[in-house]
A protein has these predicted regions:
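Dynamic "connector" segments at or just before major functional cores
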Residues: 1-171, 176-197, 201-216, 415-496
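An anionic, glycine-rich sequence signature occurring as long contiguous blocks
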Residues: 2-13, 17, 246-358, 443-496
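Structural motif
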Residues: 26, 57-66, 315-316, 367-377
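Short amphipathic alpha-helical "interface-anchor" segments enriched in bulky aromatics
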Residues: 38, 85, 333-379, 383-390
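A short acidic (Asp/Glu
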Residues: 155, 231-237, 259-263
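Short, surface-exposed basic-aromatic patches at helix termini and helix-loop junctions that form
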Residues: 215, 235-246
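Acidic/histidine-rich, metal-coordinating catalytic segments
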Residues: 220-230
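Basic, amphipathic alpha-helical segments enriched in Lys/Arg and hydrophobic/aromatic residues
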Residues: 363-427
Length: 496
C-alpha cells in the first residue's frame, strides 16, 4: 500500500503518531527464509510435485510446487480454511523468498482444483513416498500408538457420513485413523475414513501398509491402543506372525463376562495395599466369547471414596474403579505393574490430534470432493512433520515444541527485504535474547545442512540420504548412508 493510500493520526500514551502505508517489502514472517532453505535442501515438495499423478497440459497452469508451497504457508500462519491464504497473497516478500513463478501466491481454489480430479487411491499413492520419510525417524524398539478422531463437517462433502460424533450428534463427519510413534509426536501413517466406522475399522489393512516397510518391521516392537482395538481379528493378526510381528497391548472393554471374571478373583490375589486411593492389580488368563485362544489380561483396581466431599461421607464407603488390559507380552518381558505403566504412556499420542486440530487446522480444511479433503489432511500432516523436525534441529532439544509456541519463536519475526546490488538481504527486527537465540539456532541449521546431502529421494524402494534421527541399533542395510550415522545424537534426543 502506497503512502498516499493510508494516512492517519493516533494519540497513544507515547504521544501523537502518524500511521502511513509503505511500498517496501515488509513481512511478518521473517522465519520463512530459514524454513524455505530447509525445504529446498530436503527436496520433499519438489519430489512431491514431480510425482503428481495427472498430466498438466495448460501452459498457464500454476506449477504444482507453487500450489504445495502456498498451502503449506497457509498452514504455518495459522490458516484453517483454504480462503485464509488471502492474507499472504499481497505479501511480496513471501513470494520473492519462496521463488514463486508468478511472483504471487496462488488463490484459494488452486489446491482444491489440483486434487479434485484424483481418486482416493491416487491420493494415497501420491503421498505414500513422503510418508515413508517419517519411517526413518522411528527409534529402535518403537511403540506404535493407534488412535482415531472425529472431524465434524458442515455442508455437503463426499465421504462425510453420520456416525459416532460426541460433540455434534447426528452431524456428518470424517473419522481418520492414525498411527503415532510413541514419544515422538510423529505420525507414521494415516487412513482417511468415513465417520460410519469404529476405531478398529480397516486397522488390519492400515497395519499391513505400515508393515510393508522394512524399517517398520525392524523397529516396531509393540502396537498399543484403547478399547476400540482390543478385538479378536486385531489380536489374532499379531499372534499369527509366529514371533515376527510386534506384540500388542490394548485396553479391554469391561463386558459382562470380564466383570464376572473380575468378581471371581479372591481378595487375597490382588497385589498392592487395599487402602483408599491406591492402585491394586491382578493377572488373569481369560478366553472370552469369540476369542480364538486364552490371553493374558491385567486388571487394575482403584478404591475411590463414594462421596469425596470436604465434609466426608456418612458411611465411609468406597467404590471400586476397574480397568482391564489385554496383551501378549510375557511375564518375562513385563510384569503386571509394568504393563499398566506402559499403557498409560500412550496418553501423549492423543496430544497429536489435539495439536493438529487446534493449532494446524486439521479439522478445518475441507472440500466438497473427498479427494480434496483427504489431500489437504495428508498435506497438512506432512507440513506438521517437516515443521516439527525443523524445530528440533534449530532448538536442539529432546522434547516436542507445539506450533503455538514454536511459530512465535521461529516464524513470526518482523522482517524487511532489501535489494542491494545483486544481493537479497532480509533484515529481521530482533534484538537482545531473541537475536542470540536465532543466531544459535541458524548456526545449528547451517551446520546440519552442511553435513547433509542436498538431494532427497522419496521413492518407495530407496532410503532418503538425509536422516534426522539415525538408529543406534540398525541392520547393516540401514546404515549405508553417511548422514545416517553422523546424526545419531539427534535420534537419541527425540526420546527425551
Amino acid at each position: 500500500m502506497g503512502e498516499g493510500g493510508l494516512d492517519f493520526k493516533f494519540l497513544p500514551a507515547g504521544g501523537q503518531f502518524h500511521l502511513r502505508g509503505s511500498d517496501e517489502a515488509l513481512t511478518a514472517y521473517g522465519g520463512l527464509v530459514a524454513w524455505d532453505h530447509f525445504l529446498e535442501r530436503c527436496g520433499v515438495f519438489a519430489q512431491l510435485a514431480g510425482d503428481y499423478p495427472l498430466p498438466r497440459t495448460s501452459p498457464n497452469a500454476t506449477p504444482v510446487i507453487d500450489i504445495l508451497k502456498a498451502f503449506s504457508l497457509n498452514c504455518l500462519v495459522g490458516g484453517t480454511r483454504f480462503a485464509h491464504c488471502r492474507r499472504l497473497q499481497d505479501d511480496t516478500a513471501v513470494a520473492k523468498i519462496t521463488g514463486l513463478h508468478k511472483a504471487r501466491l496462488c488463490g484459494e481454489d488452486a489446491f482444491r482444483r489440483l486434487c479434485g480430479s484424483l481418486d482416493a487411491a491416487q491420493v494415497e499413492a501420491w503421498f505414500a513416498p513422503a510418508e515413508q520419510m517419517i519411517h526413518h525417524a522411528m527409534p529402535p524398539n518403537a511403540v506404535a500408538d493407534w488412535d482415531s478422531t472425529v472431524v465434524v463437517r458442515y455442508g455437503k462433502q463426499e465421504d462425510a457420513a453420520i456416525g459416532y460424533n460426541p460433540q455434534k450428534p447426528g452431524r456428518p463427519s470424517h473419522h481418520p485413523l492414525a498411527c503415532v510413534i510413541g514419544g515422538t509426536r510423529l505420525c507414521l501413517h494415516m487412513e482417511w475414513r468415513k465417520s460410519n466406522t469404529v476405531s478398529a475399522s480397516g486397522w488390519i489393512e492400515a497395519m499391513e501398509k505400515v508393515w510393508r516397510s522394512p524399517l517398520a518391521q525392524h523397529r516396531i516392537r509393540l502396537n498399543r491402543g484403547d478399547i476400540g482395538f482390543g478385538q479378536e481379528p486385531i489380536m489374532a493378526w499379531h499372534e499369527q506372525g509366529k514371533g515376527k510381528r510386534p506384540s500388542y497391548l490394548f485396553k479391554l472393554k469391561l463386558t459382562a463376562n470380564v466383570k464376572k471374571a473380575i468378581a471371581a478373583v479372591p481378595w487375597d490375589d490382588w497385589q498392592g495395599k487395599s487402602n483408599e486411593g491406591l492402585v491394586q492389580w491382578v493377572e488373569l488368563k481369560l478366553k472370552l466369547h469369540g476369542w480364538s485362544s486364552e490371553r493374558r489380561v491385567i486388571v487394575e483396581r482403584t478404591l475411590k471414596p463414594l462421596n469425596p466431599s470436604p465434609q466426608g461421607s456418612f458411611w465411609k464407603q468406597c467404590e471400586e474403579d476397574f480397568s482391564a488390559y489385554v496383551t501378549d507380552l510375557t511375564t518375562e518381558e513385563a510384569d503386571a505393574f509394568q504393563v499398566v505403566q506402559l499403557y498409560r504412556q500412550r496418553a501423549d499420542a492423543e496430544n497429536v490430534f489435539a495439536e493438529l486440530k487446534n493449532q494446524w487446522g486439521f479439522a478445518g480444511f475441507c472440500s466438497q470432493k473427498a479427494a480434496g479433503s483427504g489431500s489437504s489432511a495428508r498435506m497438512l500432516l506432512l507440513v506438521y512433520h517437516l515443521w516439527s523436525l525443523f524445530v528440533r534441529v534449530l532448538k536442539n532439544q529432546g522434547s516436542h515444541t507445539e506450533a503455538i509456541k514454536s511459530r512465535d519463536e521461529l516464524w513470526f519475526i518482523p522482517a524487511k527485504l532489501v535489494l542491494s546490488d545483486r544481493r537479497k538481504i532480509i533484515k529481521l527486527a530482533v534484538g537482545g535474547k531473541l537475536a542470540s537465540f536465532l543466531e544459535e539456532a541458524y548456526q545449528r541449521l547451517e551446520e546440519w545442512l552442511s553435513r547433509t546431502s542436498p538431494q532427497l529421494s522419496l521413492s518407495m524402494d530407496k532410503r532418503p540420504p538425509w536422516l534426522l534421527f539415525a538408529p543406534t541399533q540398525a541392520t547393516q542395510a540401514s546404515v549405508t548412508s553417511p548422514t545416517l550415522r553422523l546424526l545419531s545424537s539427534l535420534q537419541l534426543r527425540i526420546l527425551g
